Amino acid sequence: MTNAASEIGTTTSTVSRQIARLRETLGIYPFVKADGDWHLNPALRDLVTAFEQADGMLESELSRLQSYQPTAKRDVKIGAPPTVLSHMLSQGIREFVKNSPGIRPVLESRILESGLGTTDISVVFHPPESGRVRVKRCGVLDFALFAPKGWRNGDGWVSLGERVAGPYNQARRHFFNSDPTVLVDSFPQAIRVMRDIGVAGALPVIVAAQEPDLELIGPAGLDVTRDLYVIHHETRSTDPDIRATVNWVSTQLTDAKRKTRELREMQNRLCDSPA
């Protein structure tokens, strides 16, 4: 419920009351617990699909009507991990706004979500396994280990929490021979800690490239590459504003992928060069 409340910008008690009312209306529990987590009741999948389809068709029709008002701006909500927003999409936002005067991009940070939630378009690590969602793989987010100049193994390391970094931290514990010295909830926080107390940490390559005082420390076996998928609902595919925004997001991710590869090659050369 905490995650759901955060997703829609309300409190857990409000979510709890809404679920209770929904149960009364439907006559069944809307969610069931399986494998230690809550999932949509399978009996409601067709109902949810019908709502999503109706919502998508309504939004597309509203967009068509707005085309008769050339000065009106339409919000298109784009969800993505914070690094994608700050280091990939933000790079081309000025040109997009200039070329698409009828669209106002609304950027929303989303980390582990796999669906659209309340967004029109999302960039996700894992696309939904079901539902009428269009999926396009068109980018990557590369991670590697970095440290301030002069760092030596044994000086410690910083990590994001287990919810985000957990799948990768066992190998990092083995490399550093210790648990993380500090846990943080964002990469900007990690960079501040790295500078303040001289510890190492895993960072997105595209982020670390803008921090000249941080050096790649390897090893390559601990590098991580995450695919990025652009998703939107199938019923929005004919919506010109959605199409334009999806094309822009896809182009930004593709360009960032190329730049990241170039940065990675340059960092590897610097790391391998004699001191």
Describe the function of each predicted region.
Residues T2-S6, S13:
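Residues within helix-turn-helix
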Residues T11, Q18, G92:
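Residues within the DNA-recognition helix of helix-turn-helix
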Residues K73-P128:
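Central regulatory/effector-binding core of bacterial HTH transcription factors
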Residues L22-R23, L214:
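Conserved amphipathic alpha-helical core elements
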Residues R23-P42:
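A short LG(V/I)-centered, amphipathic sequence patch enriched
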Residues S6-E7, E24:
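Alpha-helical residues within the helix-turn-helix
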Residues L116, P128-G198, A202-D227, A256-A275:
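C-terminal regulatory
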Residues T25-L26, L44-Q69, A256-K259:
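Alpha-helical linker/hinge and terminal dimerization helices associated
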